[in-house]
Design a protein with these regions (language model features):
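Conserved phosphate-binding/catalytic region of the ribokinase-like
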Residues: 1-5, 188-295
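Ribokinase/PfkB-type carbohydrate-kinase core domain
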Residues: 2-7, 60-63, 68-72, 87-223, ...
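Substrate-binding N-lobe of the ribokinase-like
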Residues: 5-6, 17-82, 86-90, 97-101, ...
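Short polar catalytic/cofactor-binding loops
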Residues: 10-15
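A generic structural signal for short
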Residues: 19-21, 45-46, 122-123, 149-150, ...
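Short glycine-enriched, charge-decorated loop/helix-capping segments at active-site entrances
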Residues: 20-24, 186, 230
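Short secondary-structure capping/turn micro-motifs that flank functional sites
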Residues: 51-52, 77-78, 154, 179, ...
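N-terminal phosphate-binding loop and adjacent alpha-helix
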Residues: 52, 56, 184-186, 278
Length: 295
């Protein structure tokens, strides 16, 4: 039994592109993938269909050294897919309904297991079955909760999101999502501080794409980080998930917030030079593991 483990709850799915290409992803899956590469051995809790795509996800996890005992198999609903369309170079996403990850089953409490952090997004809250499973998981949780907001119309409701934000200590969202969820103040920093106070958070992080990220804390900190100028960007898919994975590392290892933010930006900047949301080459992670003493 691993105690003080990071639990990651939510969707594992495939993005289907117009050319027929299928790319494994889902924000929680991507985060768990990075954490595994960083020697954190996360507990990934999700559900896939009894189908070929589900088999691919399970095998990919096994090949990466990830535990699969909490990857459930649904006999009725398919492995999650997202139809990606490209219009004038901009991607659009059709997140299909009634996917296996909507039906994550509540599990029997394991009284010996202790999670240091539970990470989850907001997409997995769209269905009552998965939401109830998450409620059961967090009800007995004594550590921290990290929510990675992902507002995808029509799959979110403001009041539901607010209820979950009130249960969290750390929250990450992007600048557009902040505008949807927080009353606008004179400055972004003021808006962030109001949001932090309203939901009783310890840390609020706002990502701003190519402009980097900002954080405010209950301790009064305000931090900005920016990416380097000369990045050879392959694509930005999964940059936020890479950022979140390192934020979780910072929580787990007690890094100062400034250092955590700098390291998260550094890793996200490295990831966008690669195609796709995950990297299947451990040598990509080695410089970070060595520099951050993660062995």
């Amino acid at each position: 039994m691993i105690n003080n483990q990071i639990a990651v709850f939510g969707e594992a799915l495939f993005d289907r592109f117009p050319d027929g290409q299928q790319i494994l992803g889902g924000a929680p899956f991507n985060v768990a993938w990075h954490l595994q590469a960083f020697n954190q051995h996360p507990c990934f809790i999700s559900r896939v269909g009894n189908d070929a795509l589900g088999d691919k996800i399970r095998q990919a996890m096994l090949d990466w050294g990830m535990a699969v005992e909490n990857l459930q198999t649904d006999p009725d609903y398919p492995t999650g897919t997202v139809q990606v369309t490209i219009n004038n170079g901009d991607p659009g996403y059709d997140i299909l309904a009634e996917q296996a990850y909507d039906f994550i089953a509540a599990q029997q409490p394991d009284v010996d297991r202790r999670y240091s952090v539970i990470y989850h997004g907001t997409l997995a809250l769209r269905n009552r079955t998965s939401e109830q499973a998450l409620r059961n998981l967090t009800a007995r949780h004594q550590g921290k909760v990290f929510i990675d907001v992902n507002l995808r119309a029509p799959w979110w409701h403001k009041e539901t999101v607010y209820q979950w934000l009130d249960k969290a200590q750390w929250v990450k969202l992007n600048d557009d999502e902040l505008m949807h969820l927080a009353p606008q103040q004179n400055t972004v920093q003021d808006t962030m501080r109001l949001f932090l106070a309203r939901h009783g958070l310890e840390v609020l992080l706002v990502t701003c794409g190519s402009r980097g990220a900002m954080a405010v804390s209950q301790a009064g900190e305000y931090i900005e980080v920016v990416p380097v100028d000369d990045l050879a960007i392959a694509d930005t898919v999964g940059a936020g998930d890479a950022f979140a994975a390192v934020l979780l590392l910072g929580m787990q290892h007690g890094w100062p917030l400034q250092l955590t933010m700098e390291r998260a930006q550094s890793f996200a900047s490295a990831l966008v030079t690669k195609r796709g949301a995950t990297v299947q080459d451990l040598s990509f992670y080695r410089p970070f593991i060595d520099a951050w003493n993660l062995d």
